């Protein structure tokens, strides 16, 4: 069985377009490499501009990803355009029904 993950990306100043482009190609690359399932990925934006992504890793793929040069390079590009944000820092997570603005992938 895979693992569902939810991750927050805070765009660095002037980097939101680059972050959105990278997020749109993220899961398709992981799928091509056999690391993510075909379950539809979701992306959304918090009130303060954090991009939230939800997708499913294949069983055992998280460990494999940390050793794959293409994934490591992609994560390096993420580091150039964003900072990772714990979900607990998003004000929406304090609401019973957290609401976000949808982003088309």
Residue ranges and their predicted role:
Residues 2-10, 52-54:
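Active-site-flanking beta-strand signature of metal-NTP-handling nucleotidyl enzymes
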Residues 6, 40-41:
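A general structural-boundary detector
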Residues 10-22:
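Short, surface-exposed ligand-recognition loops at beta-strand->loop->(often short) alpha-helix junctions
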Residues 14-16, 48, 60-62, 95:
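Generic "edge-of-domain/loop-turn" microfeature
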Residues 23, 27:
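Short amphipathic alpha-helical/adjacent loop interface patches that line ligand
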Residues 28-40, 55-92:
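An amphipathic, aromatic/His-enriched active-site/gating alpha helix that lines ligand/cofactor pockets
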Residues 42-48:
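A short beta-turn/loop motif at secondary-structure boundaries
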Residues 92-105:
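Short, low-order "capping/linker" segments at domain edges
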